Amino acid sequence: MRTRRLFLNRLEATPEPQDVVVVIDVLRSFSTAAYAFTAGAAAIHPVETAAEAIELQQALPQSLTTGAVPGGDPVPGFDFGNSPAALAGVDLQGRKLIQTTAAGVRGLLRFANAPSVFAGSLVCARATADAIRRLQPRQVTLLITGEWADRDGDEDVACADYLEALLAGGTPDPAPYEQRVRRSDFGRRFAAGDNPSLPLLDLDLCARADCFHFAMLAVRRTGRFVLLPLRSGELDVTPVDRIFPAGIHQLT
């Protein structure tokens, strides 16, 4: 199994992906998504703009919106920001979420036509690696979304490094990778404590490896791109270009 790295904000054209793409956004898109699934969310619909989110919400009864603008502030009028801390104690059982963010969701949609697309974050890294290994792909593309002109994106690079070690069959100590999330440029902004949209609790929740035993797989259902939790045993081990997770029709 080969791996390669791509950086979302360096791409001029979308390269042809081979087999599996993992779109990584540790701070915070796909950490927030993981906590939403843990709170009971049935599905997450990624969309590119706030206007699309509002339009889709009207078509999906009882759905909720979550997201942030560049820099991390919540999208005005949304039910939730892009914050795992904001979901603490919230019951999302059976609800559908609509998510828009400047990095993770944009990266996910950029590779919407890839054979298999996972949303990656540190909190479900091991489960993601386990799901990918079961697919036996020839190549895995790791897409770093958090690198910007003023941010090194090392929180996502650390997650990619951890995933690579896991995919190689290793048993790496997650602690150094967790520390890199905290010490990244964006991580230090949360630690500074001077921006209410970037709470320290979010950093604490995002910089924890392997909290959850599910991967997050993006699939197309009824014409929409949907993110779903993929738990151990739900993956039908077939060639990667014919992947079908058992039970997904029950979640959408």
PLM feature spans:
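N- or domain-start disorder-to-order transition segments that initiate the globular core
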Residues: 1-8
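Short acidic, Gly/Ser-rich segments with clustered Asp/Glu that frequently serve as metal-coordination loops
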Residues: 10-14, 21-35
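Conserved active-site and cofactor/substrate-binding residues in soluble primary-metabolism enzymes
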Residues: 27-31, 48-51, 102, 123, ...
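Conserved short S/T/G-enriched processing/targeting/catalytic segments and their helical context
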Residues: 37, 41, 50
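Acidic/Gly/His-enriched mid-domain segments of enzyme catalytic cores or analogous surface patches
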Residues: 45-135, 139
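Long, charged alpha-helical interface segments
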Residues: 76-106, 110-116, 154-252
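Glycine- and Gly-Pro-enriched alpha-helical subdomains that act as flexible
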Residues: 123, 127, 131-136, 150-162, ...
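Active-site catalytic microenvironments in core metabolic enzymes, especially phosphate/sugar-handling
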Residues: 145
